[in-house]
Structure formats: C-alpha cells, structure tokens
Amino acid sequence: LGVVPPLSAMDTCGCMGASTGVAHGGVMAGDSERHFAVIGDSTFFHTGVQALMNVAYNGSNVITIIMDNRITSMTGQQENPGSGLTLQGKPANEVDIEALVRAIGIKTVKRVEAYDVDAIESTLKEWLKIDEPAVLITDHACALLPEERKQYLALDVIEEDCNGCTL
C-alpha cells in the first residue's frame, strides 16, 4: 500500500476502512497537523462513507483521497456498489461516488485520472490552504483486471540504472 520504503507514502496504515475515521479523530482531538485519509472505492462504500459523513457533519478539515478503480482490488477483484454489477454479475445500480460525497455535504470535490500525478499534487497543495473537508477521487480501472493488463507491456530492467527499490 505504499507505506514502506522506497515509497514511504503514509505515516499510519491501520485496517481497511479506518483511514477517514482515524484522520477525523486526529483533527477532533486537537492535532494541529493536516490529516489525509486514503481509501479504496469498495472500502469507502462498505465502511468509509459513515466516517466521511462525520467529517462533513463536524466540519473537519480532513482531505480524503478515494481511489476509484471500480472493483474490490485488495481481496480479489469482486464487484462493489460502484461497479454496476452484483457479485453474481447481474446489472445493478452504479453508485456515483462524487454525487454521494456531495450529497453528504462535502463541497470541495474533484475527480482526476489516477496516473495524472501533476494534477493530484497540484490539487493537494492547493487544498492545504483551505480549512474545510475535501475529497479527491482518483479514477482508473484496476491494473489487475484482465482487460487492463492487456494495455501494459512487459518491462525490462536496465540493470546499470537499477537502484534496488524492488518496484
């Protein structure tokens, strides 16, 4: 999940669904640091939306990043309320994350392509200046899905340039 080196992308990694509630708890406890929460779309539907409602209700300035890849990647690519299919593969109502986030009262919401690092970075830097809840939805299908895998070519390691990061 990007916690350990070489990425070191997070300070805390708890359990699936805890990020938004833990970040909100830090704010409510008086921590002066800005708190970020990172959560996948499926986990957001299962447990994260309740915590985000508390963030909105209490006006906490948590920045939540919802990684929308339209599937439950972490546990085996099961369908979820945002995929448009049931677990049995039957058509279902597709929950619109952005509409749901706005409906619970979050006003600062943006959807960006997950691989557009510049857009993500500039958005987060801009949002550090505001004192309100915000949600960034990163949008890209899971790379583990068979139809997505076909888009990626095998990579060759240039050994003399390798720094041993294991990525």
What does each model-found stretch correspond to?
Residues 27, 56, 156-167:
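Cysteine-centered iron-sulfur cluster-binding motifs in ferredoxin-type domains/subunits
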Residues 127-147:
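Short, structured interface segments
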Residues 2-134:
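Thiamine diphosphate
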Residues 65-68, 138-140, 165:
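A generic structural motif
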Residues 40, 142, 162-165:
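Disulfide-bonded cysteines in secreted/extracellular proteins and peptides
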Residues 76-77, 147-149:
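Short conserved micro-motifs at the rims of enzyme active sites and ligand-binding pockets
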